[in-house]
């Protein structure tokens, strides 16, 4: 049935045999306060996020692991997009999968309905747990305490969905995690409602492909992404000449990443464009010190309307040391 559904939905059928076991712990969740959907995962396997984690705004999220069939991701989303609940979608896919006993899958739909499956032949310790609008699942773990610890950590964590997903991963690692160690991790968070532009609906879409401490690196990337999200919002404010908004967003980015030269530079450009050169001076100085080529970029901006065509202003910026 999985192969038939794939053909009906225009997807190629999965391979006849299962892939190698992607020993994994993951969490799939919907934030009841914002409606955001997300998946976070860690594994002793290269590039775990490229096959395990799937999410679509306004539809649902899927983690497919163990002897992985990646088709559960797009097929699960297709079924949920068509109106099936996460439990119904997972049941339908498992019913037609002759290798269901080696699969481990978690799904949550846009209404928060959740389901998890751990096949009888998943390598132990393996299991899953369903909570309110989330599921956790793990296989090839050091101890069977991993997934209950994930659930407790997620429920107790503060912050937004990304914060809570990361807390669940940290709790899994604290319980021993994958019996073989750690290698890669990923997180994807999408907005509650689809804009019709999938690229604009992803709040986080980050992977650590190969790292001795993937969860540490994933947290670093999440923090950096938060800063860039503020930078993007600042750019949007600049586009409509809302300078107060731009300063607020660029300032938030700088608070998160105070040593980041590019963030300092564009914040300075926004200030200078708004007629506030004095507070822009230390920001330009930071960028120029990091790399003198930022000075050359200043010269190029007025011609493309990214700085006022004001020679005195440009000269004043270039004179900053």
Model-derived features: where do they sit?
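Register position in tetratricopeptide repeats
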Residues: 239, 273-274, 307
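Short coil turns that delineate tetratricopeptide repeat
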Residues: 258, 289-293
């Amino acid at each position: 049935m999985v192969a038939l559904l794939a053909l009906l939905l225009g997807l190629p059928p999965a391979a006849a045999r299962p892939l190698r076991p992607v020993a994994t712990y993951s969490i799939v969740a919907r934030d009841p306060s914002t409606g955001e959907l997300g998946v976070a995962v860690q594994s002793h396997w290269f590039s775990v996020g490229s096959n395990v984690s799937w999410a679509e705004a306004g539809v649902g999220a899927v983690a497919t692991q163990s002897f992985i069939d990646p088709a559960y991701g797009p097929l699960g989303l297709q079924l949920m997009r068509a109106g099936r609940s996460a439990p119904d979608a997972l049941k339908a896919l498992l019913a037609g999968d002759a290798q269901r006993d080696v699969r481990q899958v978690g799904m949550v739909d846009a209404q928060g309905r959740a389901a998890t499956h751990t096949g009888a032949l998943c390598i132990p310790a393996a299991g899953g747990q369903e909570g309110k609008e989330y599921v956790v699942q793990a296989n090839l773990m050091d101890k069977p305490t991993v997934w209950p610890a994930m659930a407790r950590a997620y429920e107790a964590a503060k912050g937004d969905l990304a914060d809570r997903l990361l807390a669940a991963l940290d709790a899994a690692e604290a319980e021993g995690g994958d019996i073989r160690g750690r290698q890669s991790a990923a997180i994807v968070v999408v907005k509650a409602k689809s804009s019709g532009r999938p690229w604009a609906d992803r709040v986080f879409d980050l992977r650590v492909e190969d790292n001795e401490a993937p969860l540490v690196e994933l947290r670093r990337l999440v923090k950096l992404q938060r800063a860039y999200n503020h930078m993007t919002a600042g750019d949007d404010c600049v586009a409509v000449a809302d300078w107060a908004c731009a300063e607020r967003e660029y300032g938030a980015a700088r608070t998160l990443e105070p040593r980041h030269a590019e963030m300092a530079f564009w914040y300075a450009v926004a200030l200078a464009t708004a007629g506030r050169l004095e507070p822009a001076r230390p920001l330009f100085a930071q960028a120029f010190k990091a790399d003198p080529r930022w000075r050359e970029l200043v010269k190029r901006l007025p011609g493309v309307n990214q700085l006022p065509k004001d020679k005195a202003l440009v000269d004043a910026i270039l004179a900053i040391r």
